[in-house]
Amino acid sequence: MPRLLTLLALAPAAALLKPTRRAPVPKLRVPAEAGGAVASKSSVTSSTLNLAKNIVGAGVLSLPAGIAACSASKKAAVPACGLIAGLGLVSAYCFALVGRACAATGTTTYRGAWESAVDKDSGALITGITTFKTLVGCIAYCIIIGDTAGSLLSGAAVPELLKRRDVFLSLFGAAVLFPLSMLRDLKSLAPASIIGLGGMLYTAGVTVLRALDGTYQKGGRLAAALVKEGKALPKFGGAFSPGGSLLFISMLATSYLAHYNAAAYYDELENPTLPRYNRVVYGGFAMAVGFFVSIAAAGHRTFGAASQGLILNSFAGADKLANAARALVGVAVACTYPLLFKGVREGYFDIAKVSPANQEKQRTPATIAMVALTVLAGIKITDLGFVVAFGGAILGSAIIYVIPSQIALSACKKGKLALGGAEKLACRSINVMGYVLAVLGGTASVLSRMGKI
């Protein structure tokens, strides 16, 4: 169960999104950059694909374990996938709400929408929430790098010292993560997006293939390899676990986490009208839901109760296809780390109110300290446990459900955003649901910490 907690930080109808007759379809005002140039724009297709890639992160690899926490029965995948799709729809609606609020208030950031609609003086709180959540993501990435490297190096002809998690992660942090995090222009990491998408698609393909080819079933070639390697064999059956369901719901409360980028997707959309933006949002989330369902169902069907928090750890070391997936995911995570890290560093400067001049002076020491912190956490806390489950579930629910719905309700109250009666009810319900999911996630993490789940 602690393995499942590690990746918790990493898991209304569309008609309601149509502008009401009381409000015309707005276009977002796009500020000109220095020199009068206007920022480049993205097409609907490009934005949709980018959003799908933004949503589908390494956290999807924990979903099979999430279903297993509920039940090891093969039938459990059906209602679990329905829940994945349902919360995906609600998450998409909340994502779209942020874009609508930005269009209505003339703001271009998640924090800006909050300050304009809710409270100008509490913007730092929004920055703090998103910064901490991003920091947890960086730590989770270090854990994934440590796990994938450990699996790949275990049988490799390398010095035994390098196979130690603490040694490898320390060297990797100093030689790879720190230099990448110091880059001023992250455009050079653009290929990482392609590698990441390709790696996740490949991993999904391998997971589905192994669910169908029977090699991990009793008597199968790779089942024998699991026994030889001392790994858990696939196990099915067992009763439904209410406590495990709390953890799965907490995971789903954060699986679709991308909402702090909602304003940017609207801002960068070519001809940014609400109908075009909604096509991006629902298209991107639909792709993500399909991806989540395929990996969750296939991984659970293959391993059942033996599904680990990082499903790749459940595969045999002798599985060459799975090893390739481990390598691709490891590379993608390493290249994505600096993108997350930039948000952590900038969030720290914002919260600490560091002046631009001092930011330049503190950039190197701050980067060293923060990279060291995430690497040390990845070494010492192989399972983020209570910190990720408690803080992640609460902050994730806030970012996805509570904050967007509160922005919409407050903007409506101030006359900046038109909401019909059905939408007001939907937003209030989602707002309450966000608090409930936060409480459930926090409760589940505490109970797990106490050994009650």
Model region roles, listed by residue range:
Residues 1-23:
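N-terminal chloroplast transit peptides
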Residues 21-76, 91-93:
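Membrane-interface "cap" regions at the ends of multi-pass membrane proteins
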Residues 34-40, 45, 96, 102-127, ...:
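Membrane-interfacial loop- and helix-cap regions that link adjacent transmembrane helices
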Residues 44-62, 174, 253-258, 295, ...:
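The first (N-terminal) embedded transmembrane alpha-helix
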Residues 50, 80-84, 88, 130, ...:
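Alpha-helical transmembrane segments of multi-pass membrane proteins, especially transporters
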Residues 58, 88-97, 173-182:
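Central hydrophobic cores of alpha-helical transmembrane segments in multi-pass inner-membrane proteins
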Residues 66-70, 154, 174-195, 268, ...:
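Membrane-water interface regions at transmembrane-helix termini and the short interhelical loops
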Residues 66-107:
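Extracellular loop-to-transmembrane helix junctions
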